[in-house]
Amino acid sequence: MFAACGGSSGKPDAGVDAKLEGFTDPDIVCPGGPKCMSAGDGVLKVGVAKRAYTPTNFETYTDENGDREWQSDEPFTDLNGNGKFDGVWLFGGARAAISVKTEIEARAMAFVQGDTTAVVLYIDSVGLLLGDLDLIRQHPTLAGVDVDHIIIGSTHAHDTPDTLGLWGPSPTVTGRQKFVLDALYAAAAAAVKEAVETAQPAQLVIATTKLINDESNPQSKTDDFNKDIRDPVIFDPTLTIARFVKASNPNETIGTLVNWANHPEVSHFSDTDSSEITAHYPHWLRDRVEQGVTAAQSKYAATDLAGIGGITVYVNGALGGQIGSLRGTHPPGPGGTPITEVGHVMDEAIGTNAAAKALTALADRGETFTSLPLSLKSATYNARIENTYFHVAFLIDLLGPHPLVGYNPDDPIDEGNYPWLPLRTTYLQVGPLGLVTAPGELHPELWVGGYDGSWSWGWPLLDMTKPNLPDFEAAPKPPYMRDLVLAHDGVKYPILAGMAEDYVGYIVPAYNYKLDPQDPYLVEAEGDHYEEVYSLGPLGEQHTVHPILQLLQYRR
């Protein structure tokens, strides 16, 4: 039926319209576009809302052999009486939820100025495809709600219901469940509607901090929080906290946006906690920013830190290649004792410590802005799928809904007839805050550069004994995405919003892209090359990052 076999030469498909790559002009530019001409009186209004979509009263099973995977001979609760197990499937494959640890939520922040309305919506999910994003944007709840664009992203929380479809009861059966998706769509749309309709005049207090072991020593490493476990070790440990307060009462929070790059996953690898639905550390980070952190809860709280209230929206960052809290990370728990065992306790410590750092930075060096111009630009483009596994997943309807273009579906999928994914990237600026989206797990060097070791934080840049080392001579040259965000007039605080506007897996830079010569996309190449197995293909950087750079350089 198809002949995709990987190991492509990277040559363009024969006969493919060159316009598939990149874009000509953004399709949304505000203010100044046909539906958002004016900035009005220049007053920024901000609204925020949240809704849970946590499954309730769902079917569970008895894990008789203790392998954390459901087998067809294991008993289950057949609540709907249809004779089959309709579980809530989690990341990993055949892993059905048994209980709930934390709520999973959709959280929205709306920005309104003159004719422009933009929303940042982040959902506790591993990832969301374009078809799901469209169903949220077109939800009946939003009929009549005037929004120029909704940026939709996922926190990448692993032990949330499978929204991609990759991790069902067997490799060929989707993990997507209609009752879960319907609840997610409804929750997301309701959060957007409330955020827009409750927007009120706002001011901004904003700060950053580095989540490294000793902020006064850039070489002090980062293993109180996370690590980069793929060479080269390059990542951005910056946490940005943007608190929007009422213009009429600057002591009262409307909502807060927090950005930091880290995989939410540690309890997934626990022998005891991994079958429970949870948002992982983002739940605790959001809660502690709102409610506060005591000195007893975190060594990073020098004194008891009051919460700032409101609703906190967490936006994940450039976490590809692998930025996470595994393999030797030891976040300090209550009393400062390092936590070395993965599980819910570690999730809570990561979120609590990050919140303590955020609240401290805001109190110590928060910068206030009352003039907050709002602008938005967004463009669509396409990226080619060469990954055999993704071909199969789309062909058998394993993955969620997503249009495919640039190929003939009646012919075999092969070099010369690869499908392309329509994608989108968006740049949003709110005063000094500049945010750009990436449609997956962006490798951090594509965000910051850092090939000279300047973004390695005391870790060795490379282990020279590993095979298939990166070719730094072929690495991208500046300016990098972060540089181009900062190049916008007035921007002091750059943010990369990962897993946003779509989800394409890992966005691996071409200079360090290696496939197994015998079984590409099925077996990872020797060395640090797991991420290639879950990427679009060798041209992933060219097709996804270059249009983002193009958008960032666009000026009307």
Language-model region placement:
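Bacterial signal peptide processing site
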Residues: 6-9
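Conserved beta-alpha junction segments in alpha/beta enzyme cores
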Residues: 16-153, 161-311, 315-349, 355, ...
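C-terminal motif of bacterial Sec signal peptides marking the signal peptidase cleavage site
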Residues: 2-4
